[in-house]
Regions:
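Short, P/G- and charge-enriched loop/turn segments at secondary-structure junctions
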Residues: 2, 32-38
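Metal-dependent phosphoesterase core characteristic of DEDDh/y 3'-5' exonuclease domains
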Residues: 4-12, 26, 40-85, 104-216
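Walker B beta-strand of ABC/ABC-like P-loop ATPase nucleotide-binding domains
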Residues: 15
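Short acidic, Gly/Ser-rich segments with clustered Asp/Glu that frequently serve as metal-coordination loops
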Residues: 18-28, 35
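Metal-dependent phosphoesterase signature
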Residues: 80-100
Length: 216
């Protein structure tokens, strides 16, 4: 459970989201059972990061960064329907090992804000291991580094649908851009906006949206 002051000790957060091939990250046991010549296919095809900087009692957005990623593998057609990213769009995109130093530099020592954080954590762990930066089965970032807006939203709004779009609708955040397709930077941006409002709700019991948006 998140306490009202759980972010008070931080001056910088990083909101993160990834778009993927639609495949789940296999567990370490599966990977270890594969033949020596087996090459782990990539999963992440786009990353989006939003820097959040302390601004008085709240937060402001700082640097943003996103990149597409060539997974060297197929993309599930159902995933393409969601994010609209096709293999041809990634032909000249960097591989994950190429952007990995930038990922590590951007995150630094800051907490990572994500919606349904276990998915994003698993994707990062897989790609870090695939790049031979960490062993299979280990984590790129400790679990306590993650702040999950889905968990916080469920804490404040028990029983509500917890998807990113539903959360934004409940918080009166415009999520209409997601109607056509998802994107890593867009989703990271909405996750950052949601955290700002959810923290305010947790601390003060306030609606995050201006009164004129919520009055009937």
């Amino acid at each position: 459970m998140y306490l009202p002051n759980f972010l008070d000790g931080f001056d910088r957060l990083v909101a993160f989201d990834a778009e993927t091939t639609g495949k789940r990250a296999p567990d370490a046991d599966f990977v270890r059972r594969q033949p020596f010549a087996w090459r782990a296919p990539g999963i992440i095809i786009e990353v989006g990061f939003i820097e959040m900087l302390r601004d008085g009692e709240g937060w402001r957005k700082g640097e943003i960064w996103s990149s597409r990623v060539n997974p060297d593998g197929p993309i599930d057609p159902e995933a393409i329907k969601i994010h609209g990213i096709r293999p041809a769009d990634l032909k000249n995109a960097p591989r994950f090992p190429t952007i990995l130093p930038r990922v590590k530099d951007f995150v630094g020592e800051s907490p990572i804000v994500a919606h349904a954080y276990k998915n994003e954590r698993d994707f990062l762990d897989y790609e870090f291991a695939r790049a031979k930066v960490i062993p299979w089965g280990e984590s790129a970032y400790a679990e306590e580094r993650y702040i999950c807006t889905q968990v916080l939203f469920a804490q404040l709004f028990p029983g509500a649908i917890k998807s990113l779009t539903s959360m934004c609708d409940r918080l009166v955040l415009d999520s209409s851009e997601r109607d056509d397709r998802h994107g890593a930077l867009l989703d990271a941006d909405m996750t950052a906006d949601a955290l700002i409002l959810l923290e305010r709700q947790l601390k003060h019991g306030e609606s995050g949206a201006p009164r004129s948006w919520t009055s009937t």
